[in-house]
């Protein structure tokens, strides 16, 4: 096992820095059947009460979004479109809504477990979207608020250093309702060469 990412890394006040930081890191999730791990290759930054695509827009706290207002270092998992759970890493100090959405992971460990969960899906598509990430890792609403430095979900340094030339920066996906915020280049994809 590599070195776990410390709590300090989750306390950044800059969701863009956070989204870039987690590219190339190793996400691991443990259940009673073992551990599934993989390298994060796609993220999106969400942050601050002014971000119309962020669940904390306008500092409105609801039962659904209250996790994003907590101190960084926990998982924010929610159900989207009545179909998918999505995994976010909460960032920053308590009271400021910031998170990084985990959009894509290359599975490196626990492949047999993922093969069971993703029957009939080619390996290259197991976790190449945010809903696919949670299905592959077995993440659901019971993981909302779980520590990211604990024994259920954690992130490690992988030893990978990504050249800036391999990071594609685009607008976020699925947030057309957010006006000018929909066009901001807050999605980051590692285009592995």
Curated annotation (Swiss-Prot):
What Enzyme Commission number(s) does the record list for this chain? Answer: 3.2.2.-
Q: Does the keyword DNA repair apply?
A: yes
Gene Ontology terms: biological process:
base-excision repair
NCBIfam families registered for this protein in UniProt: 3mg
Query: Mind telling me what this protein is named?
Result: Putative 3-methyladenine DNA glycosylase
Q: Which family does it belong to?
A: Belongs to the DNA glycosylase MPG family.
Record's Pfam families? Pur_DNA_glyco (PF02245)
- InterPro entries, from UniProt? Formyl_transferase-like_C_sf, MPG, MPG_sf
- Entry keyword annotation includes DNA repair: yes
Q: Which PANTHER family match?
A: DNA-3-METHYLADENINE GLYCOSYLASE
Q: Which GO terms describe its molecular function?
A: alkylbase DNA N-glycosylase activity; DNA binding
Keywords on record = DNA damage, DNA repair, Hydrolase
